[in-house]
Amino acid sequence: GEECDCGSPGNPCCDAATCKLRPGAQCAEGLCCEQCRFIKAGTVCRVARGDWNDDKCTGQSADCPRNGFYG
């Protein structure tokens, strides 16, 4: 299956012909993906509102997980 979105040939992380990540790339897009690499664990990817915790990258995924309610 697809590893990345082939729709954008300008993406340096994704091979538009095969829809696969380029060699050495961990990710192609996402709040926790920067320059084709996962952002380090603990980096805030979504600032919380109210009593919620800030959402932080896991270091293992390009997605920004919902970290949940504080308290």
UniProtKB/Swiss-Prot annotation:
Protein name: Disintegrin ussuristatin-1
Pfam short name (any one): Disintegrin
This protein's record includes keyword Secreted: yes
Function: Strongly suppress platelet aggregation induced by ADP, collagen, thrombin, and epinephrine (IC(50)=17-33 nM). Also dose-dependently inhibits the adhesion of human melanoma cells to fibrinogen and fibronectin.
Reported tissue expression: Expressed by the venom gland.
UniProt cross-references to InterPro entries, sorted A to Z: Disintegrin_CS, Disintegrin_dom, Disintegrin_dom_sf
Signal peptide start and end residues: none
Additional detail: The disintegrin belongs to the medium disintegrin subfamily.
Source species, domain of life: Eukaryota
GO cellular component: extracellular region; plasma membrane
Record note on quaternary structure: Monomer.
Molecular function in Gene Ontology: toxin activity
Keywords: Cell adhesion impairing toxin, Disulfide bond, Hemostasis impairing toxin, Platelet aggregation inhibiting toxin, Secreted, Toxin
Family note: Belongs to the venom metalloproteinase (M12B) family. P-II subfamily. P-IIa sub-subfamily.
